[in-house]
């Protein structure tokens, strides 16, 4: 396997990002738009993630304005689809930069999050598993083509194909049924080892053991029509999540999921009021990790090799001992 220098790595990062976003926008019919780094705390537009991660917040001493740094743009994108009057079956994407200060740091997790956040306007009739799978297949096609072109240019992998021809679909309940004695991350590891590329469906939905596979905010994804694109990373020998996506909630599903998660107070926020009042279009959307994709396609040992972030002293010392050059 070829080892890239620091400069070669930076050039490869740009190549991958240009290649992937151009292909993705063409495949899904997306227009690039500008995105905010900070938003109003009372707008309801920020991503609450699993519910316990606090966003970075501050109040300006000069103008008194309170702001939150975004954690993702899941709800902002749907709001923007309506604002920009995006036509049916067209959408938008953006370079999303976020800070998640409560993230547990490791080889694939950073406090700095960079991803392509995308959203596509669809119809109410498209709220079904078939449409979801079709969209996943389109994204996987872009991913697989990018992998082949990156390897052709840089010779990263010994084999031509790092990814299988098709992605495997499985629900979180099916994973529980197959591996009842394993925890969710162990189930993901086993299914990724077997199929190499997997779309794990219905994340956030309560399973037969009365637990959820993983937490998901109740006000953007429909928990029965969402999922994560995961791959097996031969470098780390671990499952790697590259994307989280889903068909978004309609009014009925929003009310149901807020009730189930005991978060009905969100109905007082601007975004949620607009959704309940029918002012927002039906959409499908998601986020694709830019650094994660580069980390995977370039077969790096640490995401800090493809992303300039801030790390704990322990991680810096460990990386240096292993010869890992953090950006």
Swiss-Prot record:
This is Aspartate--ammonia ligase. Pathway: Amino-acid biosynthesis; L-asparagine biosynthesis; L-asparagine from L-aspartate (ammonia route): step 1/1. GO terms for cellular component: cytosol. Belongs to the class-II aminoacyl-tRNA synthetase family. AsnA subfamily. InterPro entries: aa-tRNA-synth_II (IPR006195), aa-tRNA-synth_II/BPL/LPL (IPR045864), AsnA (IPR004618). The lineage of its organism: Bacteria, Bacillati, Mycoplasmatota, Mycoplasmoidales, Mycoplasmoidaceae. One of its GO terms (molecular function) is aspartate-ammonia ligase activity. It is an enzyme of class 6 (ligase). Keywords: Amino-acid biosynthesis, Asparagine biosynthesis, ATP-binding, Cytoplasm, Ligase, Nucleotide-binding. It comes from Mycoplasmoides gallisepticum (strain R(low / passage 15 / clone 2)) (Mycoplasma gallisepticum). PANTHER family: ASPARTATE--AMMONIA LIGASE. It is found in: Cytoplasm. Its EC number is 6.3.1.1. It comes from the Bacteria. Pfam families: AsnA. The keyword Protein transport does not apply. One of its GO terms (biological process) is L-asparagine biosynthetic process. The keyword Iron-sulfur does not apply. It catalyses: L-aspartate + NH4(+) + ATP = L-asparagine + AMP + diphosphate + H(+).
């Amino acid at each position: 396997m070829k080892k890239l220098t620091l400069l070669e790595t930076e050039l490869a990062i740009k190549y991958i990002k240009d290649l992937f976003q151009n292909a993705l926008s063409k495949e899904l019919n997306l227009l690039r738009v500008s995105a905010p780094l900070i938003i109003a705390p009372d707008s309801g537009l920020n991503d609450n993630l699993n519910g316990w991660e606090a966003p970075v917040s501050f109040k300006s001493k000069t103008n008194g304005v309170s702001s939150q740094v975004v954690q993702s743009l899941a709800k902002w994108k749907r709001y923007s689809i309506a604002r920009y009057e995006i036509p049916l079956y067209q959408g938008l994407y953006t370079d999303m930069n976020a800070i998640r200060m409560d993230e547990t740091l490791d080889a694939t997790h950073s406090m700095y999050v960079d991803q392509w956040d995308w959203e596509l306007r669809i119809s109410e009739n498209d709220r079904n598993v078939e449409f979801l799978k079709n969209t996943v297949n389109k994204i996987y096609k872009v991913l697989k083509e990018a992998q082949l072109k990156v390897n052709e240019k840089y010779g990263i992998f010994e084999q031509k194909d790092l990814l299988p021809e098709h992605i495997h679909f499985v629900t979180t309940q099916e994973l529980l049924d197959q591996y009842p004695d394993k925890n969710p991350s162990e189930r993901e590891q086993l299914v990724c080892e077997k199929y190499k590329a997997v779309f794990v469906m219905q994340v956030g939905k309560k399973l037969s053991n009365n637990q959820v596979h993983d937490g998901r905010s109740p006000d953007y994804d429909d928990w029965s029509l969402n999922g994560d694109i995961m791959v097996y990373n031969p470098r780390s020998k671990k499952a790697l999540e590259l994307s989280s996506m889903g068909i978004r909630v309609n009014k009925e599903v929003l009310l149901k999921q807020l009730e189930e998660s005991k978060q009905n107070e969100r109905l007082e926020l601007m975004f949620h009021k607009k959704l309940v009042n029918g002012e927002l279009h039906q959409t499908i959307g998601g986020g694709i990790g830019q650094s994660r994709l580069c980390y995977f396609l370039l077969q790096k040992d640490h995401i800090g090799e493809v992303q300039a972030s801030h790390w704990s002293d322990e991680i810096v010392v460990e990386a240096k001992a292993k010869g890992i050059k953090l950006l």
